[in-house]
A protein has these predicted regions:
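Short, acidic Ser/Thr/Gly-rich low-complexity loop/linker segments typical of extracellular
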Residues: 60-80
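Structural motif
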Residues: 37-48, 149-152
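Short coil turns that delineate tetratricopeptide repeat
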Residues: 169-171, 203, 237
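Start-of-helix register in tetratricopeptide repeats
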Residues: 141, 173, 207, 241-244
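Canonical tetratricopeptide repeat
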Residues: 177, 211, 244-251
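A short, solvent-exposed loop/turn motif at the edges and junctions
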Residues: 90, 94-109
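Register position in tetratricopeptide repeats
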Residues: 152, 184, 218, 251-258
Length: 258
């Protein structure tokens, strides 16, 4: 398993001073849920045999995670996928399809779900629809695919070497794609400036906003993450994306910060 965000060095600093007002039963044995979703192209076409991976970074109430931390599956002919075993916490989901740039997002999953010996899991009422995109058919696009291959192989040094060559004149989509690849490699320090540059190029960039929201969440900066997820939701007209983004915003609303 790849290092659990060893390069998110600022995570604990971002969470310092945050007081979580926990639900009475937030501790103890946590129920698991089934999360369903789809992987489709930008045009909505199902992507068969895409790899879907889920990794937990924090547990209930954004504390220490206990249990099975990673899951992986593949999509069927309709692009559908399903994972049983998602416990309350903060999870990073990624979808990788052949010849596509990975789609990746961190989400809160029932952070303050009541627990106990009779607590049972259930199917989450929203589906996580992820949309990997094709890279440009030119040397720049091949550079992104090389970085993707290295990221999936856990070769962080190669990822850093490739992504540091991102052209200065790259557009927002290209920069956001590079940021997602950096996040797949768990190189948060490299992903952040790429997402920020993407937003500077295009303040309406959906994927750049989603990348920033994910980074805030992985740092447990819940207030900033909530605002960033709201900004992300405002940048898409896709009803499925709006639904799971609304679920994330609602989940973060259960955490009160003093």
């Amino acid at each position: 398993m790849r290092p659990v965000m060893s390069r998110l060095g600022c995570a604990t600093l971002a969470a310092a001073g945050v007081l979580l007002v926990l639900a009475p039963a937030a501790l103890g044995q946590q129920p698991v849920s089934r999360l369903k979703g789809r992987v489709v192209s930008e045009r909505g076409e199902p992507l068969k045999d895409a790899d879907v991976r889920a990794e937990a970074f924090f547990g209930a109430a954004a504390g220490t995670f206990a249990g099975q931390r990673t899951f992986s599956t593949k999509t069927n002919a309709k692009g559908d996928w399903s994972i049983l075993g998602i416990a309350p916490g903060i999870w990073l989901f990624e979808a990788v399809a052949p010849e596509h740039i990975p789609e990746i997002v961190a989400l809160p999953i029932r952070l303050l779900t009541p627990s106990g010996p009779n607590a049972g899991g259930q199917v989450l009422i929203w589906e996580l629809v992820l949309k990997p995109v094709r890279p440009p058919e030119d040397p720049r696009g091949r550079m992104l695919m090389d970085a993707t291959t290295a990221a999936r192989a856990g070769k962080s040094d190669e990822v850093r070497a490739v992504l540091r060559q991102v052209p200065e004149d790259a557009d927002a989509e290209y920069l956001a794609a590079a940021g997602r690849i950096a996040l797949v490699a768990r190189e948060a320090g490299l992903a952040r400036p790429l997402f920020m540059r993407a937003l500077e190029r295009d303040p309406a960039s959906y994927r750049a906003a989603m990348g920033i929201a994910s980074l805030f969440l992985l740092q447990r900066d819940f207030d900033s993450a909530s605002r960033a997820f709201d900004a992300t939701r405002n940048r898409t007209h896709d009803k499925d994306e709006q639904k799971w983004l609304s679920a994330a915003i609602g989940d973060l609303a259960t955490i009160k910060v003093r």
